[in-house]
Regions:
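Alpha-helical substrate-recognition element adjacent to the catalytic core
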Residues: 32-215
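Bacterial N-terminal signal peptides
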Residues: 14-27
Length: 215
């Protein structure tokens, strides 16, 4: 009987193949251990620059390091975190509230800018200018306790839906921005919202939707 002994060339090929398999397995394990920090973002220079910025900021001992108690990230809301079409969500809430409150304010039927809202006359409302807008916001945001106003906001958001997507407005948030908020927080940033919308309208739901506390 003769035993076939592989030649040195074959042994080298087998050894190299085994090394390649180990290297590929290690690479796959390494990738699995490092989840994508911004999974809904397309790979590209914008995503890379965000990740690189955060890595610089959190790297102790580097010129770019920022202590955790000084890390903040500030976001706009309308058009940045959620949809602003076909109109600002708070404005839709305000006009609906004017129509509901008008049942106890019959004089609004003849007073501008309330008359314009009740008749859906957006040109007349636009012509009322900043002063008209202020009157509407004062009428809808005053005369109630903080808790009562919060309840009215939450009830409205629970029942009203986007005319095109037929989904609650709080569902129409941008997932990439939610990923970004979460990524900053995981790296010690405190997140804030600066918006043209009123804080009374936003505070009741920003914690649930964005993870941003109502402070």
């Amino acid at each position: 009987w003769k035993v076939a002994v592989p030649g040195r060339k074959n042994l080298r090929l087998c050894f190299v193949s085994v090394l390649i398999c180990f290297w590929m397995a290690a690479a796959l394990l390494s990738a699995a251990e490092k989840p994508d920090p911004l999974p809904s973002w397309n790979d590209g220079p914008v995503k890379s620059s965000i990740v690189e910025f955060v890595q610089r900021v959190v790297s102790v001992g580097t010129p770019s390091f920022v202590p955790e108690d000084q890390r903040i990230a500030v976001f706009d809301n309308d058009g940045t975190l959620w949809s602003e079409q076909p109109n600002y969500v708070e404005w839709l809430f305000v006009t609906d509230r004017i129509k509901a409150l008008a049942q106890g304010r019959p004089e609004w039927k003849t007073q501008q800018p309330f008359k314009a809202v009740l008749e859906n006359d957006w040109k007349a409302l636009h012509d009322s200018g900043q002063e008209g807008m202020q009157k509407i916001y004062i009428a809808t945001h005053s005369g109630t306790t903080t808790a009562e106003f919060e309840t009215s906001v939450l009830e409205w958001l629970a029942k009203e839906k986007h005319p095109r997507f037929n989904r609650p407005y709080t569902d129409l948030v941008y997932q990439p921005m939610l990923d970004l908020l979460a990524y900053f927080r995981r790296n010690g940033f405190k997140t804030f919202i600066v918006s043209g919308g009123s804080i009374d309208f936003m505070r009741p739901w920003t914690q649930r939707v964005y993870g941003v506390p109502p402070e």
